[in-house]
Swiss-Prot record:
Residues 62-65 are annotated as: G3. Residues 15-22 are annotated as: G1. The keyword GTP-binding applies. Residues 41-45 are annotated as: G2. The gene is era. One of its GO terms (cellular component) is cytosol. GTP binds at residues 15-22, 62-66, 123-126. Monomer. PANTHER family: GTPASE ERA (PTHR42698), GTPASE ERA, MITOCHONDRIAL (PTHR42698:SF1). It is found in: Cytoplasm; Cell inner membrane. Belongs to the TRAFAC class TrmE-Era-EngA-EngB-Septin-like GTPase superfamily. Era GTPase family. InterPro entries: G_ERA_dom, GTP-bd, GTPase_Era-like, KH_dom-like_a/b, KH_dom_type_2, KH_sf_prok-type, P-loop_NTPase, Small_GTP-bd. It is a peripheral membrane protein. This is GTPase Era.
Length: 296
């Protein structure tokens, strides 16, 4: 009896902002590593999530939402990240919100590779009132691009994800696993700590959050079993600092507390976290800063 061949490959998750890409990846790997928010382009780095099973390893790449509304070096770098991801994967998941096929979706569709299998993933299936309406929507989309497959899911509730993996699996090349079977991301704890703080900023500041905002880990040290982490929130202008800090420091305190609790859960250990805000004018349009933050 011959052994079942192992398959391993890279899968890009692409779509317009706020369509559920990060939520989908978090559910596919069974762990929250990519931050989620209603604000566009929450994901600013290509985050890799790994799902391993008996005969296959899926390496998912969560990309920033492609959009042209914001201008400047930061947005150009994020859009470039999407394009680069599409050129180096074995399969692409093109994520759409059910019953919404917008100009922004078509912009992403125009980037889809012709020689790499692309699976249409229709998310938020509860948006469709019945199966006939949903099928008509799918027919409209598939008339504009030749997809390798179609799957309807609910990323938020983790529904039909096994069926989605079944569609992806045949497109993975025969290969030994690239990562240990218990590894869920190639990002280190320093990166994940920064992402957790960014998520809390999005959650507590909402529409007040400056687009030109980033976080920088200034210290990450192990003190026995304790992680000591110092993180600076970077804003572009002085008047943006009070937005993040809040009256009497209340917002920043909530952000820091919730971030620390999430880190302790993810890292399975105690964390001492300090977060503060500082101005770094022009960073979002300075290619040197973007390169420093890995956003070039």
């Amino acid at each position: 009896m011959t052994d079942t061949p192992f398959h391993c490959g890279f899968v890009a998750i692409v779509g317009r902002p706020n369509v559920g890409k990060s939520t989908l990846m978090n559910h596919l790997i069974g762990q929250k590593i990519s931050i989620t928010s209603k604000k566009s382009q929450t994901t600013r780095h290509r985050v890799t999530g790994i799902h391993t099973e008996d005969a296959a390893q899926f390496v998912f790449v969560d990309t920033p939402g492609f959009q042209t509304y914001h201008k400047g070096a930061l947005n150009e770098a994020l859009n470039k990240s999407v394009k680069d991801s599409l050129g180096s994967v074995d399969c692409v998941l093109f994520l759409l919100e059910a019953m919404r096929f917008t100009a922004a979706d078509r912009e992403v569709m125009a980037l889809l590779p012709k020689k790499t299998p692309v699976i249409l993933v229709v998310n938020k299936l509860d948006k469709a009132k019945d199966k006939l309406t949903l099928q008509a929507f799918i027919d409209e989309v598939t008339a504009e691009f030749e997809f390798a497959g179609v799957e309807v899911v609910s990323a938020k509730h983790g529904q039909r994800l096994a069926e989605l993996l079944d569609q992806v699996r045949p497109h993975l090349p025969e290969s030994m696993p690239l990562y240990p079977e218990d590894m869920i991301t190639d990002k280190n704890e320093r990166f994940l700590a920064a992402e957790i703080v960014r998520e809390k900023l999005f959650r507590y500041l909402g529409e007040e959050l400056p687009y030109e905002m980033n976080v920088e880990v200034e210290m990450f040290e192990m003190d026995g079993a304790l992680r000591r982490i110092h993180i600076a929130v970077l804003v572009d202008k002085e008047h943006q600092k009070p937005i993040v800090i809040g009256r009497g420091g209340e917002k920043l305190k909530k952000i820091s507390t919730e971030a620390r609790l999430d880190m302790e859960k993810l890292f399975d250990g105690k964390v001492f976290l300090q977060v503060w805000v500082k101005v770094k004018s022009g960073w979002a349009d300075d290619v040197r800063f973007l390169r420093e933050f890995g956003l070039d």
